[in-house]
UniProtKB/Swiss-Prot annotation:
Its main location: endoplasmic reticulum. This is Calreticulin. GO terms for cellular component: endoplasmic reticulum lumen; endoplasmic reticulum membrane. A motif (Prevents secretion from ER) lies at residues 421-424. Residues 270-308 are annotated as: 3 X approximate repeats. Glycans are attached at N61. Residues 217-262, 356-385, 402-424 have a biased composition (Basic and acidic residues). Keywords: Calcium, Chaperone, Disulfide bond, Endoplasmic reticulum, Glycoprotein, Lectin, Metal-binding, Phosphoprotein, Repeat, Signal, Zinc. The gene is CRO1. Residues 1-29 form the signal peptide. GO terms for biological process: ERAD pathway; protein folding. Belongs to the calreticulin family.
Length: 424
């Protein structure tokens, strides 16, 4: 009896486990695109010929970079300064309607970027990938952009009705020379989240943080401020009166401490007058004091009315066609490395992917970078020392030449004196 009960218990546990696994499988995220730039990556990506005829198209290198956490973990890196870059990959077309969309990738600016982009684009429809460039329409643009001191931010741009809409929030990007993971999550409730290195940096409503739709309400264009509306917050104090004789107070008065010089001659110098000084009693033009207006009604504002041009879009977050991912940018200084692309509908899956790629190597990469910087500083210090030695050698050589010239001049002078003596 006990054995039968135990068998029933095992069976129930097995069923429960099976149901749990089925539940996990049912909610498991879907991966629409993933790229770690391993073997065969070139067959999945198309290098654009955009700007090639102008000799302004930059080349991509397949590399792990100058410093890394794993030399076998490679991405693609811009390799030429002052060049345009464009490359794209196609994946099975889908729409994020009624589902979450996650776009994630890592980027490293090894060149200490001072002007250039590090963003990616999602595109729909049919794209001629060989002609993919700056004028190619896109659905989403996301990622860091740096240029000088004024631009150091994460771009998040949505294209709706053939118009690019920029996020109204300022989201700072990373500016060091290490790899960082940028994640954009778009939820079907029209909210979004931006993360850097799996840490949330910005979130909110797409309705509020982008001007995609016209406002729901507008000021009534027909409304006029009533003529008797009192919008003066302060008024002159009727009890405040100007003192008698106030206007007669002079701005300057003769200096009472001034004395006529003893050698002053009225006939020759004219009548002496004391110099003037600012009058301490003079307070400037009289101004009536002001008091709060008891009838103040506040600043008049036109009443708000429903905007006749507003039309709600419950799918403001959605894009009907997402079919390509592309990198299109201009770089003054090359060296930006892209890796670990992921498009999915599961934020947790994206978080795990980031930890298993970037997170796994970030400490080793930081150590490699620190070692490279240390070596660079030592080489620069050694070169500076060599330059100082060269300068010292040049100075010593100049001194020797000067001494030789002085000795030569002295000898010539002696010979000349001897000749003159002989002549005498």
């Amino acid at each position: 009896m006990a054995i039968r009960a135990r068998s029933s218990s095992y069976a129930a546990a097995a069923v429960a486990l099976a149901l749990a696994l089925a539940s996990v499988a049912a909610v498991a995220g879907e991966v629409f695109f993933q790229e770690k730039f391993e073997d065969g990556w070139e067959s999945r990506w198309v290098k654009s010929e955009w700007k090639k005829d102008e000799n302004m198209a930059g080349e991509w290198n397949h590399t792990s970079g100058k410093w890394n956490g794993d030399p076998e973990d490679k991405g693609i890196q811009t390799s030429e300064d002052y060049r345009f870059y464009a490359i794209s990959a196609e994946y099975p077309e889908f729409s994020n309607k009624d589902k979450t969309l996650v776009l994630q990738f890592s980027v490293k600016h090894e060149q200490k970027l001072d002007c250039g982009g590090g963003y990616v684009k999602l595109l729909g429809g049919d794209v001629d990938q060989k002609k993919f460039g700056g004028d190619t329409p896109y659905s989403i643009m996301f990622g860091p952009d740096i240029c000088g001191y004024s631009t150091k931010k994460v771009h998040t741009i949505f294209t709706k009705n053939d118009k690019n809409h920029l996020i109204k929030k300022d989201v700072p990007c990373e500016t060091d020379q290490l790899s960082h993971v940028y994640t954009l999550i778009i939820h079907p409730d029209a909210t979004y989240t931006i993360l850097i290195d799996n840490v949330e940096k910005q979130s909110g409503s797409i309705y509020e943080h982008w001007d995609i739709l016209p406002p729901k309400q507008i000021k009534d264009p027909e409304a006029k401020k009533p003529e008797d509306w009192d919008d003066k917050e302060y008024i002159p104090d009727p009890e405040d009166k100007k003192p008698e004789g106030y206007d007669d107070i002079p701005k300057e008065i003769p200096d009472p401490d001034a004395k006529k010089p003893e050698d002053w001659d009225d006939e020759e110098d004219g009548e002496w007058t004391a110099p003037t000084i600012p009058n301490p009693e003079y307070k400037g033009p009289w101004k009536q004091k002001k008091i709060k207006n008891p009838n103040y009604q506040g600043k008049w504002k036109a009443p708000m009315i429903d905007n006749p041009d507003f039309k709600d879009d419950p799918y403001i977050y959605a894009f009907d066609s997402l079919k390509y991912i592309g990198i299109e940018l201009w770089q003054v200084k090359s060296g930006t490395l892209f890796d670990n692309f992921l498009i999915t509908d599961d934020p947790e899956l994206a978080k795990t992917f980031a930890e298993e790629t970037w997170g796994k190597h970030k400490d080793a990469e930081k150590a490699a970078f620190d070692e490279a910087e240390k070596k660079k500083e030592e080489e620069e210090a050694a070169k500076a020392g060599e330059d100082d030695d060269d300068l010292d050698d040049e100075d010593a050589e100049d001194e020797d030449k000067a001494d030789e010239k002085a000795d030569s001049d002295a000898e010539d002078g002696k010979d000349s004196d001897d000749e003159k003596h002989d002549e005498l």
